[in-house]
A protein has these predicted regions:
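A generic structural signal for residues embedded in beta-strands
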Residues: 36-37, 111, 516-519, 548
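His/Asp/Glu-enriched, well-ordered alpha-helical/loop segment
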Residues: 205, 340-353, 357-383, 387-388, ...
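Carbohydrate-interacting/catalytic domains
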Residues: 7, 548-549
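Short alpha-helical functional segments enriched in proximate histidine and acidic residues
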Residues: 99, 213, 497-498, 539, ...
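Divalent metal-binding segments
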Residues: 2-11, 15, 19-280, 295, ...
Length: 551
């Protein structure tokens, strides 16, 4: 070792995620990198005296948690919105009324997190008018794939009397044709046109406040699942909020940013370059550094299971969700357009993250990736399918053969699992959020939450990946449960692999980034029902203690 370590961690139970050395008790850090791992602290430190020594007294040290699908700015913004995770419409309306009473007339009332499978129905514009007179009201669904607004908003949009047709979305209406206030998928862009873009200062604050929560939960890296446009982006210059947060010392965790496909446009590059679409200057996946980097292009192919808008090959079970007993959901754009966009982004050198929840949409994504590889061969493009929620067994095998990474959310089981089980019906329960099938097929499994759709604490995610129970206690496709070791690997090395960053993070090995999460106990050694209750003692990023629960 050429110089003394900055930090030496000793008396630790180190779970390295390195098959060559699964466990250790000491780790040395210098210059933000791991420089030694082993069981002899003196040897790990290279015989030198470390500047700081941290005695972990038997606590468990793991690679820092990495959430592979997380809406960081969306979560930061949600912290100032009404929490609508309630079990009845009466409670929802009461919370809206309380916020309205405390808000100056004319200001927006914004809430998030309601689930009609728990409240019994979607909120209605007329009820919102009564509880929040004089305010524009915008309530976001738990899935983020739909929202409800009141009459003032509908009037601003010029659609308070009749519902327009929206490509890739729907403005719901009652039997008389009058809009109810419910807006699905791309119809939400109409509301966004009234409220966005948000000021960069507000978005920068959202990055910072979200990061503070993440540190408390042991997160050291996130993949932001869509910036720059469409119904999910907050501003066309959203990346600048992350840059500003970093310049101000308020980017607390490492961030990889997916760029939404709406931000892509035709580029007049030289024909030999093969770059037909992209973002300006030819920036693409991989641009940046270990703190802030451009990730894949994010493209939405369909919607959500909770909202019954995901594109399925057969109709939804029970309540169709939109009055159509043959409802199979829908794609968010023409299939040919979606396919060509994926192929063009692949050709231009981007990794692609295709949101595909229903098995019909998954077929489209797999077909597009197959066509892209055939037309424009690339070595290990490592494309992704976000969610891969209702996947047939043949689709598991095909994803494995294509080298596509399905990025699921085990965390969904507890918070919204009951609603998804009801949506697909018993015959398709075995399709839901596969884990065991993917691992058995040789696919690398990442860990992610889709926060703020659900509470994104990684330990809760690991708990759900192992236990697979809904809020009501029902099994959530229990045959797809995995072990604590496998779930922990997913939230560390697996997520790094999904970001094509396993060479710099995801395991405790010499040369890798010094990002660690320190836990009160070993998640692989406690009973499965105790995983959620473990404590994050400290979070270390870049070799520095960024969070210490014990001062």
């Amino acid at each position: 070792m050429p110089y003394a370590p900055d930090l030496l961690l000793v008396n630790a139970n180190v779970l390295t995620m390195d098959p060559a050395r699964p466990r250790a008790s000491a780790v040395a850090v210098a210059g933000g990198r791991i420089v030694g791992v082993g069981d002899n602290a003196a040897e790990v430190a290279g015989g030198a005296r470390a500047r700081d020594v941290l005695d972990l007294k038997g606590a468990t040290l793991i690679p820092g948690f990495h959430d592979a699908h997380n809406h960081m700015i969306g979560f930061g913004l949600s912290l100032t919105e009404i929490d609508l995770r309630v079990d009845s419409l009466d409670e929802l309306y009461a919370r809206v009324a309380a916020r309205a009473a405390a808000t100056p007339a004319g200001e927006w009332i914004i809430g998030a997190g309601y689930d009609q499978t728990k409240t019994g129905a979607h909120p209605h514009r007329d009820a919102l008018d009564r509880v929040a007179p004089g305010h524009r009201v915008w309530l976001k669904h738990a899935s983020s794939h739909m929202c409800v607004v009141n009459s003032l908003v509908l009037r601003d949009l010029g659609i308070d009397v009749t519902a327009p047709q929206v490509d890739g979305g729907r403005v719901a209406a009652d039997a008389s044709g009058r809009p109810t206030g419910l807006m699905e998928e791309r119809a939400q862009e109409l509301v966004g046109d009234l409220t966005r873009p948000y000021p960069l200062a507000r978005l920068t604050d959202a990055v910072a406040t979200a990061g503070e929560t993440y540190l408390r939960e042991g997160l050291t890296s996130v993949t932001e699942a869509g910036v720059g446009g469409g119904w999910i982006g907050q501003s066309p210059v959203e990346l600048a909020a992350y840059v500003a947060a970093r310049e101000q010392g308020r980017l607390h965790v490492r961030a990889e940013l997916m760029v939404i496909s709406d931000a892509f446009h035709a580029l007049t590059a030289h024909p030999s370059d093969g770059i037909e679409i992209g973002i300006d200057l030819g920036l693409r996946t991989g641009f940046g550094d270990d703190w802030l980097r451009l990730g894949p292009m994010k493209i939405f192919t369909d919607g959500s299971l909770l909202g019954r808008t995901a594109a399925m090959s057969a109709p939804y079970d029970g309540d169709p969700g939109n009055g159509d007993s043959n409802n199979k959901g829908y794609l968010q754009a023409d299939a040919g357009h979606l396919t060509q966009t994926i192929i063009a982004a692949h050709q231009a050198g981007w990794r692609v993250a295709a949101h595909a929840i229903g098995d019909g949409a998954i077929d489209l994504a797999l077909d597009a990736f197959d066509a892209a590889a055939s037309k424009h061969p690339r070595r290990d493009p490592r494309h992704r399918i976000e969610h891969f929620a209702a996947a047939r067994q043949d689709q598991v095998a095909r994803a494995a053969a294509l080298g596509v990474i399905p990025v699921g959310q085990g965390r969904f089981a507890t918070e919204i699992g009951d609603g998804m089980l009801a949506a697909v019906g018993p015959d398709r329960h075995p399709w839901l959020y596969r884990q065991r099938s993917l691992l058995d097929a040789g696919v690398v499994l990442p860990g992610s939450s889709d926060r703020p759709v659900v509470t994104g604490t990684p330990l809760l995610g690991i708990h759900d990946m192992v236990n697979r129970r809904t809020a009501s206690g029902a099994p959530f496709n229990a045959g797809e449960a995995i072990t604590a070791e496998e779930a922990l690997r997913a939230y560390t090395w697996g997520s790094a692999y999904a970001s094509k960053a396993e060479h710099v993070k995801g395991s405790v090995e010499a040369g890798k980034l010094a990002d660690f999460t320190i836990l009160s106990e070993d998640p692989t050694a406690v009973s499965p029902d105790r995983i959620a209750g473990l404590e994050v003692i400290a979070t270390i990023v870049d070799g520095e203690v960024r969070y210490d629960a014990r001062g």
